[in-house]
């Protein structure tokens, strides 16, 4: 079955590639989150991809030295966010505005999740990086309608973003109410 709407994760560990496809393309050394751009460039070269909805590999997240277990840290902002921006620029450079907007939509969702998660960080880190996220989203405000009109977008996510842009404090309060009260009630109702 051919399916253009399957969202493929950036991770390199869950893919097999033909060597010829890689050509001269290599992972950059000394960079974290390098698979975000690398995987996108590699998939853009491919004439055919096959997706198996089958677990054939057991990835260990808590591996010593793995950045997957680091949680929120400065690398997210110094390496990961720039990698997402580079990925989007690449998608636009090859004429895939549609995919660039889908990517941006998921990027915005991720930034809102980071904003919430930063609540558990040390005060100086929390304030610094929440400010970075807030400024980025306010800067992008003019592009929100286009991005949230992409094929992958959920209208509820746009509402969350609108609340955040009006007041990050209100956004956090709404999320807390949702997590503490609304989600548990919905889960109980589904069980009955």
Give the positions of each predicted feature:
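Donor-binding/catalytic cores of nucleotide-activated saccharide
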Residues: 1-52, 57-75
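Catalytic core of nucleotide-sugar-dependent glycosyltransferases
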Residues: 56-63, 69-98, 110-113, 117-144
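Membrane-interface aromatic/basic loop that binds lipid-linked glycans or pyrophosphate carriers
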Residues: 120-192
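General small-molecule cofactor/ligand-binding pocket signal
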Residues: 50-52, 102, 145-147
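All-alpha amphipathic helical-bundle segments outside canonical DNA-binding/catalytic cores
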Residues: 98-106
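Short charge-dense sequence patches
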Residues: 28-40, 80-85, 170-174
């Amino acid at each position: 079955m051919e399916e253009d709407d399957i969202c493929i994760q950036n991770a390199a560990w869950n893919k097999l590639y033909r060597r010829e496809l890689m050509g001269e393309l290599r992972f950059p050394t000394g960079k974290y989150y390098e698979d975000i751009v690398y995987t996108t460039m590699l998939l853009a070269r491919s004439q055919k991809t096959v997706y198996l909805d089958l677990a054939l590999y057991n990835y260990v997240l808590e591996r010593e030295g793995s950045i997957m277990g680091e949680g929120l840290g400065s690398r997210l902002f110094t390496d990961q966010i720039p990698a997402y921006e580079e990925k989007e620029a690449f998608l636009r450079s090859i004429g895939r505005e549609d995919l660039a907007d889908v990517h941006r939509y998921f990027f915005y969702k991720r930034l809102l999740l980071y904003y919430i998660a930063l609540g558990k960080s040390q005060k100086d880190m929390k304030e610094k990086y929440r400010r970075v996220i807030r400024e980025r989203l306010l800067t992008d405000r003019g592009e929100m309608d286009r991005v949230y009109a992409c094929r992958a977008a959920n209208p509820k996510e746009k509402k969350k973003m609108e609340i955040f842009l009006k007041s990050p404090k209100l956004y956090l309060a709404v999320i807390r109410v949702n997590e503490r009260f609304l989600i548990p009630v919905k889960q109980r109702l589904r069980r009955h």
